[in-house]
Amino acid sequence: MAGARAGAAELGRSLVVVYPELGEPFRQVFASIIDGIEDKLGGSVMSLAVANNANPAGVAEDIRRRDIQVLIGLGRGGMRIAAALAGELAVLAGCVVSVQESEARSFPVHTLAPDPGLLLARLKRLKPGTRRVHLVYDPKLNAWLVKLAREAARAEGMELLAQEAADQAGALRAYTQLLASADPARDALWLPQDPTTVDDSTVLSLVLREGWNRNMAVFSSHVAHVRRGALFSLYPDNREMGRSLATAAQRLAAAPKAAVPGALPLRQTLAAINIRTAAHLGIDVAAAQSGFELVYPSN
């Protein structure tokens, strides 16, 4: 046990966390993640805030001059620095939204997309009669997530009906058609983190309005959508995410060549529910509220 703690502390001294220099609330998000990393490693770690206009090559050169073995890049700014050093250091990225598969070919990228298995288990608990889950997605961004979602749906006794859309016009057509033909008693609609197929004005307004009118469950990977009327969402537990990134960094330091590149879903989650929507769908609100950290509308 003491040896493990000593090893963790030693890693902390040779690890750097790089993140974008942003205002609140993002600064506090990164601070909580770093707190989790330090808690797991049992000591402070070097952290480096990088301005948006910083040259990744210059930042990478600064890091090369330090005695660093592992780099954790947070957000897109941190991921750019990780990419610049991927051939030299053990690197991983975390707290990243909407990752193209091409961006995750060289190192692991821990995204903010909630794990489909966690989302679908939550859906099954709230709406046990759900048999089919509809999803409209951009394959350049979310093909990896859809693969995981198909497996998760099978495990929950559901079928995933995923439609590809290359632009917002195609997404609107797909949503209009599926909302017109879906069976609200057995179908649900999932809004992923996908800027191509889910925008906060046209698409969200259409889906939430028609979902409400047809008594169909709409859940989302964006917690802000719950306030607008989506049934539920999962969102990051930032400190626990930091602890998980520290564990991944420990594995990476121990066996750099064993690291598997690619996008990974978020498993360190908290949950939000809209009880007005739940009541409208005939869900027992008192029972539904347990296990949710955020409840809308708030009293």
Listing of model-derived features with the role each one plays in the protein:
Residues A254-N299:
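Hinge/cleft segment of the Venus flytrap/periplasmic-binding protein
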Residues V18, R64-G75, H134-V136, A185-D199, ...:
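Periplasmic-binding protein-like
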Residues V45-R65, D167-A180:
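Structural motif
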Residues I33, L112-E156, A263-T277:
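An alpha-beta-alpha
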Residues G87-P116, H222-L231:
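Flexible loop/hinge segments that line or gate small-molecule binding clefts
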Residues R13-I33, L48-A51, D194:
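Extracytoplasmic "Venus flytrap"
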Residues V99-S102, P108-R132, P236-P256:
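Hydrophobic alpha-helical segments within soluble ligand-binding/sensing domains
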Residues A49-V99, T196-L208:
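Beta-alpha junction/loop-to-helix N-cap segments that form part of ligand/metal-binding clefts
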